[in-house]
Amino acid sequence: MSPVLTQHVSQPITLDEQTQKMKRHLLQDIRRSAYVYRVDCGGCNACEIEIFAAITPVFDAERFGIKVVSSPRHADILLFTGAVTRAMRMPALRAYESAPDHKICVSYGACGVGGGIFHDLYSVWGGSDTIVPIDVWIPGCPPTPAATIHGFAVALGLLQQKIHAVDYRDPTGVTMQPLWPQIPPSQRIAIEREARRLAGYRQGREICDRLLRHLSDDPTGNRVNTWLRDADDPRLNSIVQQLFRVLRGLHD
């Protein structure tokens, strides 16, 4: 009896719910592909590498109808990368003015979002939001291809809203409660800034969130002590002690 060959048998392709939703946006609402134009405002090209990785067959952003074009006059989505330098400010503005309405502006990468490590240089204006109105932010240094495609998905939803002039407003009287209402905003901001300075953006935010959660549940600090004892990490202990010094300085 001859063996059954399986390597050349065609397998059906199944799409997840998010992919199907994006395709419905393109086919029913936008009714055409969404064209993306890159505006390099003065970056190191790491963001460009990730953008091109996102449109390769591995991640295949084109399956959602997302295509990169070479002229802003054809673009629906403008993708601003890099910190805005003085030399690139006017070219970036010309690209923005050349793109037809209704356009979506995306700030891509840490430098595009807020200037990154170059934010305070004499030749840098800051993030791309200093020169154009930004609709979508994609943070990262650089953002991953998965984060890039997710940002494109958000941009597609906004593009649909702009094309059909859809506006959303919160119901009257509805307010958002802070995550930790027991802790004043000034203290939360000071702790988060110091934690990010000591441990970086990602780990600093995680340490800050966990510390605030423990302090919110147990102001006596017993849960914080248990957390530090279980972690058994001298570096974490040093960071948390510094954050407590910041808190005491605010109370003094």
Curated annotation (Swiss-Prot):
Q: Which keywords annotate this record?
A: 4Fe-4S, Iron, Iron-sulfur, Metal-binding, Oxidoreductase
Task: Give the binding site residues for [4Fe-4S] cluster.
Answer: C41, C47, C111, C141
The record's free-text note on cofactor binding: Binds 1 [4Fe-4S] cluster.
Q: Which domain of life is it from?
A: Bacteria
Q: Which PROSITE patterns match?
A: COMPLEX1_20K (PS01150)
**UniProt cross-references to InterPro entries, sorted A to Z:** Complex_I_20kDa-like, NADH_UbQ_OxRdtase-like_20kDa, NADH_UQ_OxRdtase_20Kd_su
Q: What class of enzyme is it?
A: oxidoreductase
Names of the cofactor(s): [4Fe-4S] cluster
Keyword Metal-binding assigned to the entry: answer is yes
- Drop me one GO molecular function for this one: NADH dehydrogenase (ubiquinone) activity
Q: Does the keyword Metal-binding apply?
A: yes
What Enzyme Commission number(s) does the record list for this chain? 1.-.-.-
State what this protein does. Answer: Possible component of hydrogenase 4.
Q: Which family does it belong to?
A: Belongs to the complex I 20 kDa subunit family.
Name-wise, this protein is Hydrogenase-4 component I
